[in-house]
């Protein structure tokens, strides 16, 4: 069932996710009850993830902060870029390469504010990086958050209320490059 679930949902079968399973229950006088999982419904888990994203976006909208970052004026040519990413991320390397070899010959200053881009500490790590940038806000034109593609569960750290609220209200435009083009996180929805 695990491979079926992971292939169907694009996320790892780990603790903390909600699942809907079909089971049989048996009773043995000596050993007691036993439960056998017969099937799993991956659409239930996908629905729960989508519901959580909708609830966060609705809460941000009710608080009046959902579109605040989008309303900030974007510099015509943002040249001082604070990057939140992992130093070893391929996406970060690709981003820097594209800036360095741009067809216009423009110079861009980038500074990396390292953060974890996967796992249970994504929210805390990215928020800490944003705090560091905020302490030096006058040195930058924009913030870019970069995390390459992966399984849907790998991107769940970007679907949190605290991180979305912080980015929505950040005083600089926040640009996201999270996951593949088809991926959509709460953070993408609030970013510039």
Which residues fall in each region the model found?
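Short nucleic-acid-contacting surface segments enriched for D/E, G, S/T with interspersed K/R
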Residues: 2-21
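Short flexible coil/turn linkers enriched for glycine and charged/polar residues
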Residues: 15-17, 29-31, 75-77, 89, ...
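OB-fold/S1-family single-stranded nucleic acid-binding modules
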Residues: 20-55
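Short, charged beta->alpha transition segments
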Residues: 20-24, 65-71, 98-99
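Acidic/polar active-site rim loop that often engages polyanionic ligands
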Residues: 32-42, 75-79, 186-192
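Short N-terminal or domain-adjacent regulatory/targeting segments
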Residues: 43-75
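Short glycine/threonine-rich loop/turn motifs
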Residues: 82-192
């Amino acid at each position: 069932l695990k491979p079926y679930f992971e292939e169907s949902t694009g996320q790892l079968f780990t603790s903390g996710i909600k699942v809907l399973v079909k089971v049989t229950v048996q009773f043995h006088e000596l050993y007691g009850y036993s439960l056998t999982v017969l099937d799993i419904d991956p659409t239930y888990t996908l629905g729960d993830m989508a519901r959580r994203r909708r609830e966060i976006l609705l809460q941000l909208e009710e608080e009046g902060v959902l579109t605040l970052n989008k309303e900030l004026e974007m510099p015509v040519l943002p040249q001082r870029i604070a990057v939140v990413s992992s130093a070893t991320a391929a996406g970060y390397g690709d981003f820097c390469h594209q800036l360095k070899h741009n067809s216009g010959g423009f110079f861009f200053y980038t500074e990396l504010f390292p953060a974890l881009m996967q796992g249970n500490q994504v929210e805390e790590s990215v928020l800490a990086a944003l705090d560091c940038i905020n302490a030096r806000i006058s040195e930058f034109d924009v913030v870019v958050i970069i995390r390459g593609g992966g399984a849907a569960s790998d991107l769940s750290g970007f679907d949190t209320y605290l991180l979305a609220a912080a980015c929505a209200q950040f005083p600089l435009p926040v640009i996201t490059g999270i996951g593949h083009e088809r991926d959509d996180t709460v953070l993408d929805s609030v970013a510039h």
